[in-house]
């Protein structure tokens, strides 16, 4: 079973996305911010991470940079799911190591299609 780490400061979004992904057959872990995600990654080895960009504390771009420094996560796909639509943010996220980008609100079928491409 493929494991996905969801990182977002909205617990409502985390729970709804978790339900969608679990129904599709993924194991899901959640974190409400960058620091919590890094703590989980000390022991968790997900196949993919989905993160928001705008979170209190550590933002998503900083989180991606930190995750990519971890030897066990260097090659893990990272999908950004955010309300941000600025091209500069996309460029910054890709430079940090993001693999893909989805703008909220995301349709479940769109998310699942992207996941199948990133972690077949």
Sequence positions of predicted segments:
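Short hydrophobic/Thr-rich beta-strand motif most characteristic of the beta2 strand and flanking loop
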Residues: 25-32, 40, 102
